[in-house]
Amino acid sequence: MSKKSAPKPIKTKDGESAVLATIAAMPEPSRAMGQRLHAIIKANAPALSPKLWYGMPAYANKDGKVVLFFRSEEKFKERYMTLGFNPEANLDEGHMWPVAFALTELTATEEAKIAALVRKAAS
């Protein structure tokens, strides 16, 4: 009777490394936008932890729940990158508020809006 070998442990990267590797693998212009989004999110919501969520960059709260994410247009063959917020994001505003944004370019104006949204979402 032969012994079954123990399953090999799965080697995983830490969240930050996994997110950076995923962004680095994106084609341009998604890669540049992803790098910029990552920097904005890290600067404005340092308490959120980067991780992969459905293979795309995401940022989770202390309970491990994804607050916000972005995905490249290539993921779903769309014409824009998406920045999205989950129910854990503190964006409630009356009875209706946006939870996803299409991004085709990042200028200083969009970066300022994103920074404010990220701060509010993580508050």
Range-by-range predicted roles:
Residues 1-123:
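Charge-dense, helix-prone N-terminal extensions
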